[in-house]
Amino acid sequence: MTLVDWFLDTIALLLGLLHIWIARHFQHWEEKGVHHVAPQPLVGSMLRLLTFSVSPAVFIQGVHEAAGSHPYIGFYIFGRPALLVRDPSLLQHILVKDFSNFTDRLTSSNKHKDPVGAANLFCIKGNRWRQIRACITHTFSTARLKIMFSRVLNSASVTRDYILERGNQPINVKDLFVRTSLDSMCSTLFGIESSTLYNSEAQFLHYGHKMMRWTPYRALEALAHFFSPELLNVFDTRLFECESTEFLINAFSEAITEREKTGLYCSDLVDSLIQLKKQLIDVSEHEVLGQAMLFFAAGFETTSSAMAFAMYELALHPEIQDRLRTEIQEVTACHGGQVTYEGVKKMSYLDMVVSEVLRKYPPMSFIDRVCLHDYHIPGTDVVIEKGTPIFVSLLGLHRDSIFYPDPEDFNPERFNKEKKSGVHPFSYIPFGDGPRNCIGLRLGLMSVKLVIIMLLQSLRVETHESTPVPLQLSPYVLFLKNLGRLPLMFVPIGEDNVETSLA
């Protein structure tokens, strides 16, 4: 046998072994009789993500749509079988009823290379997650939200004044509400004045944008963190961008240290982090700062995008805007002309509008869990093996015509009492559900509602000739946000409404 023959035989053998490996791994769902996305060699179902053709949000939505009328669908993360669930009843089992078997997320970071990123509530697993979440949960209790209310309302009123000062010119609400939510979040959760609304060069704004900037390399990092944690042992990657992490860690460390020195109690996240250090004597500095980083990152994008999407839809639907403004005026009139915590809770149409915004534009486009023990899907013969990743496309679920007819239409009436009662509750989960839902959802909702209230009291929001219709979502980000600028017009509706008092 010549060297060439030996080489060709070796190649043939390797290709044969590769074919056997691929066939064995990619027959998992077929052998179970589960409807699945046809895999491709080596990459499984991940080709569109690997070629940057779509964002993770659109990728998972595509898997959801491929399920058709099936309650779930299998796919492959490279050679690893994964399952996407679209049936609300099964989701209720996974997220709530059988939560003990699905407590962990797949999302991870390498604790040796990225100790802060790996230590946040989104990534930590098992009993440690329970311990830290229990210490942080009271940050968002009703009592504390009432204290935070005035801070959030003040930030919303400053935003209104900023718009009024700009006069008759279009405002890019995408940028505006990033600054608004950043100032509100820093003040409300950390006791820090970030001063970004009037200062485009503010450091918190600069590093916030840097943290969320989406590049091809960051896309690959996201692929590892959210879909294939095994790759974290190969690549030197971080959940949060390095330079912004360094700046924010220093800022949050200073805030915590200063609060510990003064003993000042502000009923915010900093107080909860100090309490965390006292309650868990073995808690690390990385775990404390990891929570601060998580809340900053989550609040920076999700809340601001919800505000921008809300204003965009209200500009496109003036009849909805007028009805909402009327409700705001009537409720505030019953509360002495003031915007109060109790008054906001009585604004039922506002709640319907915000619910529809979050249906059409869910803050998190998908959620994930990991099956901790073999799990028999109720009512079937299918068993999900231990270690199988489970995904839910919130974007796909909320825009599924089976649950929401004409899903691209903006229609708050979907959430009136009559229609809401006729829809499975787990077909609408913008913040997830169960014990591992979004811990800050009540603060996020309050922030969005107060901005809407303060702006609609004084201003009419309208489209501009440069406003994109229809809206294009960015294919390059993890959280939902529009592609490019989002200019809208704000027209004062009368001086009598501008001076509404705060409470």
From Swiss-Prot:
It is found in: Endoplasmic reticulum membrane; Microsome membrane. The lineage of its organism: Eukaryota, Metazoa, Ecdysozoa, Arthropoda, Hexapoda. It is a peripheral membrane protein. Its EC number is 1.14.-.-. It is an enzyme of class 1 (oxidoreductase). Heme binds at C438. The gene is CYP6L1. Belongs to the cytochrome P450 family. It comes from the Eukaryota. GO terms for cellular component: endoplasmic reticulum membrane. GO terms for molecular function: heme binding; iron ion binding; monooxygenase activity; oxidoreductase activity, acting on paired donors, with incorporation or reduction of molecular oxygen. Detected only in testes and accessory glands of male adults. CDD domains: CYP6-like. The keyword Phosphoprotein does not apply. Keywords: Endoplasmic reticulum, Heme, Iron, Membrane, Metal-binding, Microsome, Monooxygenase, Oxidoreductase. This is Cytochrome P450 6l1. Its cofactor is heme.
